[in-house]
């Protein structure tokens, strides 16, 4: 009852609407948080691929200068495999787009991390609000002896 008084809820329908809104808001924030985490993961993976590519590029240039020598390939097989993997990862993550500068990637990662932190704070408060609203609604339903099935039958009458 205290929750209902704090929220100025006097009708059962208001309580139902409040609970539905809280659940909707929570699910929307969950989805935003998931998307932000996915973007952050992709950005970090791309940054790692760029670093690996830059470190192994001189080995590939040496391989090319040696006219794709089998001997050079045998000596530097691991580095060349890492180079190819980094290049493939960048191609896959960029999807044909131009490679952004490392400073831009760092800034994007910083912005995504800040957004994730802000969303997570909002997510926690929305989660608590949802739990409260759903618990109060469940308690009121129990006190009134109303379940979803009984309520539907009453509406059909």
Predicted regions and their residues:
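Extended intrinsically disordered terminal tails
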Residues: 1-157
């Amino acid at each position: 009852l205290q929750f209902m008084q704090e929220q100025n809820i006097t009708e059962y329908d208001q309580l139902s609407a409040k609970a539905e809104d809280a659940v909707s808001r929570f699910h929307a924030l969950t989805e935003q948080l998931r998307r932000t985490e996915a973007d952050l993961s992709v950005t970090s993976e791309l940054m790692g691929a760029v670093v690996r590519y830059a470190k192994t590029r001189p080995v590939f240039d040496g391989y090319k200068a040696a006219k794709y020598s089998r001997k050079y390939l045998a000596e530097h097989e691991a580095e060349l495999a890492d180079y190819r993997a980094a290049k493939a990862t960048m191609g896959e993550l960029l999807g044909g787009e131009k490679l952004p500068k490392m400073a831009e990637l760092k800034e994007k990662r910083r912005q995504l991390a800040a957004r994730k932190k802000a969303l997570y704070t909002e997510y926690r408060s929305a989660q608590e609000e949802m739990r409260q609203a759903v618990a109060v609604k469940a308690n009121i339903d129990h006190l009134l002896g109303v379940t979803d099935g009984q309520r539907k039958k009453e509406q059909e009458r």
